[in-house]
């Protein structure tokens, strides 16, 4: 009876987010009722095509009813023609006892790869802990006759986490086979690094003598077997973003997924090492096996170090990276073990890196700080409110966007964190309660509001160089080179457009960042007659699928005055911000503005840099920018999905930049950033968070793991 009542409540929930949260009550009711009636009610709900959201909730509730009928229902769902039901059944089976009849369907999902393959792999590995031979023999059979190199690699990677002699025998065979594809041999070698046997050690030693590409993989795996932790390391903070190639020079910012988060982690890591009580920061990101090998040998005992997590194969966009969970977990574990001392791990988003890192942190008993943001909650709420997403198609969209999994991941990360960090935003407490179901007023000591920060000095130097160059004064060689590179781009403009100011937007070429939307708004309005548009970001030579989608849209509306600069280093962007304000003699007029057309912006590093450079800005009306953009004074807040509104706001920003209040606006923006949003202020606030996170653990910590302890 309770199951029926709560099912009705899930179906009647006024919003999609409220229905998702009500799913927990459905599981409790189903477990309480138990028996065939509850199973039949849930099965009917799972198969109801009119309410795909309730169907997903029913699948996960079924998994908690330990009844033979529930197993049979989940088996049926595992073979359903609808992808979202198969995915959630595969996920749900992980909470049940091993079911031999489900192994075949799960292997087929693993073969197909993608997000569903990751879920299937997870369930198979959960079962392998109690029935290793069942899973190992199934994988061994699947390898026979399989020719697809990526599929073979997935099977071998999965086998690598199955305990027992059967799995190790297969790994040794694959690693030794010179006729085997590289991807599978690499997966076998990587897994052998976690096997204690002498045979595994001998195999890795042999493979380690080989050149690239297999040699570095084997040598890194060998290092796994004999980790020599860094001695004498002081209090250490680890942070990560595994979708970017992050180095101290930020040479790849703006390409692929190397966005504002990469800039933030580099600047923040440098600033944190200046804080009392923090000796070392380790920033983990994507890298090659050769880079990982070098980094393991050279992890610093102090200062800001960079450590790559290696993956086999080319980089993939963040939404497609879920199948790299196993590799991410192994790479993160390797680095944190080699680091010797890690006092706290800071996670910032609900992605595969955080999923993997959280598992490693639990294993190594490292306290976690998690930055909580309403993502994907805000997107779900927006689509729900606009009618673009409903119960009728939630599952189909979920199969692409993984909404349910990401919502649950945020919930789990926030619940497990020793401390959570929040971005400032209007009505923060209400947003956290309504969207995430988190009451930050109940235990305020567990939450801290910490705004992001920027390297103001870098922006100031860039602005000063651009001002001097515009006045005909000499500037430093590197600044001159950057400004000359901008001139070369501007020289492509027709002569009649070289007297116009610039509208600048910096960011990844991704639909969330709205670069194509901005180009369309500019090209289809009088804004095009007012200014040229300069878009900075993306890999123009080897674009990712997301970048290609944006470039195709941009090129559809391309016209004289639109310039694509590709990704540029952070220092270059700082000088170009100054050039937008002060102009480039013979190429661009002074009095430009900055436009952020992001669909959502939790805070906005690039916006803060533009304000610090004295530019008026256009920014999304929702999220973080609303807390620092002063409407009509330092910029304009707008619905960035509305082309007309975006163009009008950009025109107003140009009016402000050229009007009598231009200097007042610039000073106001700069002062605001200096007072509230420096990277040093952010580091100071976070250092206090880290102290609290390591001091207030429920489990005992060794005294030398408490941040700041001697």
Question: What does each model-identified segment do?
Answer:
Residues 2-46, 50-54, 63-74, 80-83, ...:
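Catalytic cores of nucleotide-sugar-dependent glycosyltransferases that transfer UDP/GDP/TDP-activated
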Residues 56, 87, 118-124:
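Sequence termini and other peripheral, non-core segments
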């Amino acid at each position: 009876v309770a199951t029926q009542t709560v099912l009705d409540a899930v179906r009647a929930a006024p919003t999609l987010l409220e229905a998702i949260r009500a799913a927990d009550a459905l599981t409790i009711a189903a477990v309480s009722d138990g028996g065939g009636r509850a199973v039949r009610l849930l099965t009917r709900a799972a198969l109801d095509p009119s309410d795909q959201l309730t169907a997903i909730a029913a699948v996960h509730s079924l998994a908690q009813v330990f009844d033979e009928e529930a197993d049979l229902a989940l088996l049926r769902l595992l073979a359903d023609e609808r992808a979202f039901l198969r995915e959630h059944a595969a996920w749900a089976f992980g909470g049940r006892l091993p079911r031999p009849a489900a192994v075949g369907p799960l292997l087929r999902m693993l073969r197909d790869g993608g997000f569903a393959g990751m879920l299937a792999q997870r369930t198979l590995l959960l079962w392998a802990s109690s029935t290793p031979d069942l899973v190992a023999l199934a994988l061994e059979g699947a390898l026979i006759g399989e020719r697809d190199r990526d599929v073979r690699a997935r099977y071998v990677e999965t086998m690598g986490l199955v305990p027992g002699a059967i799995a190790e025998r297969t790994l040794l065979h694959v690693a030794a086979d010179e006729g085997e594809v590289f991807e599978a041999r690499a997966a076998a070698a990587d897994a052998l690094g976690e096997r204690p046997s002498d045979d595994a050690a001998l195999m890795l030693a042999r493979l380690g003598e080989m050149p690239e590409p297999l040699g570095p993989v084997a040598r890194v795996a060998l290092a796994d077997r004999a980790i020599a932790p860094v001695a004498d390391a002081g209090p250490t903070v680890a942070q990560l973003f595994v979708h970017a190639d992050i180095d101290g020079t930020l040479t790849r910012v703006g390409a692929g997924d190397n966005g504002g988060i990469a800039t933030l982690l580099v600047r923040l890591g440098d600033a944190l090492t200046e804080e009392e009580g923090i000796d070392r920061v380790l920033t983990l990101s994507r890298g090659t096996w050769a880079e990982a090998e070098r980094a393991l040998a050279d992890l610093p005992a102090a200062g800001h170090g960079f450590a790559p997590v290696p993956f086999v194969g080319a980089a993939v966009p963040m939404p497609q990276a879920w199948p790299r969970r196993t590799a991410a977990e192994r790479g993160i574990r390797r680095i944190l073990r080699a680091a010797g001392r890690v006092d706290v791990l800071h996670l910032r988003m609900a992605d595969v890196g955080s999923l993997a890192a959280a598992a490693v942190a639990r294993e190594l008993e490292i306290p976690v700080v998690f930055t909580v943001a309403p993502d994907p909650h805000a997107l779900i709420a927006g689509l729900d409110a606009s009618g673009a997403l409903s119960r009728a198609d939630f599952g189909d969209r979920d199969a692409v966007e993984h909404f349910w999994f990401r919502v649950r991941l945020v919930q789990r990360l926030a619940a497990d964190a020793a401390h959570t960090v929040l971005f400032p935003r209007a009505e923060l407490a209400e947003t956290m309660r309504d969207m995430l179901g988190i009451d930050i007023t109940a235990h305020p000591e567990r939450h801290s509001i910490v705004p992001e920060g920027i390297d103001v000095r870098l922006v100031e130097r860039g602005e000063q160089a651009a001002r001097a160059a515009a006045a005909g004064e000499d500037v430093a060689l590197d600044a001159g080179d950057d400004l000359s590179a901008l001139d070369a781009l501007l020289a492509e403009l027709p002569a009649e457009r070289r007297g116009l100011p610039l509208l600048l937007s910096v960011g990844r070429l991704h639909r969330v960042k709205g670069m194509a939307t901005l180009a369309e708004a500019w090209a289809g309005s009088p804004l095009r007659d007012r200014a040229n548009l300069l878009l900075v970001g993306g890999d123009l030579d080897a674009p990712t699928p997301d970048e290609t989608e944006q470039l195709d849209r941009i090129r559809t509306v391309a016209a004289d005055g639109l310039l694509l600069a590709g990704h540029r280093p952070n220092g270059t962007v700082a000088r170009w911000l100054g050039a937008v304000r002060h102009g480039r003699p013979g190429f661009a007029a002074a009095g430009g503005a900055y436009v952020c057309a992001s669909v959502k912006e939790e805070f906005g590093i690039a916006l803060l840099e533009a304000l610090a450079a004295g530019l008026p800005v256009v920014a999304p009306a929702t999220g973080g920018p609303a807390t620092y953009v002063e409407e009509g004074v330092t910029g304009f807040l707008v619905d960035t999905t509305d082309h007309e509104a975006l163009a009008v706001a950009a025109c107003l920003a140009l009016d402000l930049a050229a009007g009598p209040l231009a200097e007042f606006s610039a000073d106001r923006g700069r002062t605001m950033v200096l007072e509230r949003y420096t990277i040093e202020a952010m580091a100071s606030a976070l250092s206090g968070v880290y102290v609290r996170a390591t001091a207030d653990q429920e489990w005992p910590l060794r005294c030398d793991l408490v941040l700041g302890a001697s």
